[in-house]
Amino acid sequence: MSARPEALVAIYADESCLGNGREGDNPGGAGVLLEFRQRDAEPLVRRDLWVSEPATTNNRMALRSVIESMTAISRKGRRFRVTFTTDSRYIVDGMTQWVHDWARRGWTRKAGPIENLELWKQAVAAASEHAVYWRWVRGHAGHAQNEYANDIAVRAAGDQSSSAGLVESGFDAWISARLAKARPTVLEPFPDGAIFRASRTLPTPHPASP
């Protein structure tokens, strides 16, 4: 990674699994909105990213949102400060608490096998490339960027598509349509880099099983 000063990126992520918890193959998707500035005081740049799986769970897709978004920004060849906003307690609690306990125990836990262990390891490895603040918001509460990420995830789950990386965002058109319908919407301001504080440094992921 480049040693240039760490730029700030805001990531909003959500996941969808159609029929989550039901028997059979339940298709799912993960949706991500990224916001950043090329230079200070310039307008925000937005990019979308989405992935899908034909048979999955909400938790798997939440982890995929971390892996895919962190991997995408790592391709820029530099380290970023990242505010990762999600309505998934599974991700926020996992990244700020559980992974540290699991790592101390050699990536095991007393209660039995760790669900989605290999995805957790991949998520930790991908996020460790950056300084990340893990932020939870209540889902479906009018938070514009996360509502948008949810819509991307639902669409990806339904049509089983992938953006194959970062693409131009449709957020501006989406929020204009939402405001025109007078739907409750709170546009999150871009994070203030002057007060950014990363969450606890992630542990080193245990080598993946052969």
Where would I find each of the regions flagged by the language model?
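Glycine-rich loops and low-complexity Gly/Arg-rich segments
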Residues: 35-39, 59, 107-111, 158-163
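Short, conserved alpha-helix that lines the donor NDP-sugar binding/gating region
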Residues: 62, 66
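Acidic two-metal-ion nuclease catalytic site recognized across multiple nuclease folds
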Residues: 158-210
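RNase H catalytic domain
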Residues: 15-23, 27, 67-148, 174
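Low-complexity, flexible helical/coil segments
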Residues: 44-53, 117-125, 168-176
